[in-house]
Amino acid sequence: MATVRPFDKMPMLNAAALLLVGTEESHREQLASAMLKEPKTFEVKIHMAQSLPLPYEREHLRPRFDMVVFLINLHSQLSLSTILASLTQLDVNFFLGKVCFVATGGGQVKHCMVDIATVKKLADTHLSTLLFSEFASEDDVTCTAQRLLQMLKICAGLVPGISALYLGSFMSSTLQTDQF
C-alpha cells in the first residue's frame, strides 16, 4: 500500500487531479458527476477511493493529486472512523491547504450518529477547510462542486498569485461573514 504524497510526481499542464475519499459510493459519484458537468477552463481528473492507503499496483498510473477531499457522512460512525484511519496514510504536506472535509447529512440533526462539533474539531486540528452539504438536494451538490472546483484550481496552481496556503484564511473570512 502506498502513502499519498503531493509532490512525488510532475504536475499536469492546465489540469488538476482530485482524490475523493469516503465510504458512501453514491455521494462520491454524485459529487464527481456534478464537478465534471460544471464549465471550467482546465481539465479535471477525479479519482475515488473508499479509504486510504491506495493499492500500490496502479501507483505508476496515478496522477499527482492536487487536492484530497474527505466525505464524512454524519449518519454513519463507520464513515468517520474510516476517514480517521485514512488520514494517517496521507503525507503531511497535503495539510498545507490541499485537504478539504465535506460533511453530509447535517440537516437532520436528530438522526446524526457523528457530532458536528467532532467534525469541526477534526478540520481545525488538521488546519483544513470544512464544507457542509446535503446530497439529497441537487442544488446543494452543484454548489459544493463549484466551491470544490474553485479550491482545486487554486491547489493546482492555476490561479496566478494565490497559493493553497491562503485557502484557510480565505475560507475562514467567508465563514465569519456568512454567520452574520
Curated annotation (Swiss-Prot):
Pfam families, alphabetized: CENP-M (PF11111)
Encoding gene, per UniProt annotation: cenpm
GO cellular component, one term: nucleus
Function in brief: Probable component of a centromeric complex involved in assembly of kinetochore proteins, mitotic progression and chromosome segregation.
InterPro entries documented for this protein: Centromere_Cenp-M, P-loop_NTPase
Alphabetical UniProt keywords: Centromere, Chromosome, Nucleus
Top-rank lineage group of the source organism: Eukaryota
Protein name per UniProt: Centromere protein M
Subcellular localization(s) per the UniProt record: Nucleus; Chromosome, Centromere
Organismal lineage: Eukaryota, Metazoa, Chordata, Craniata, Vertebrata
PANTHER family: CENTROMERE PROTEIN M
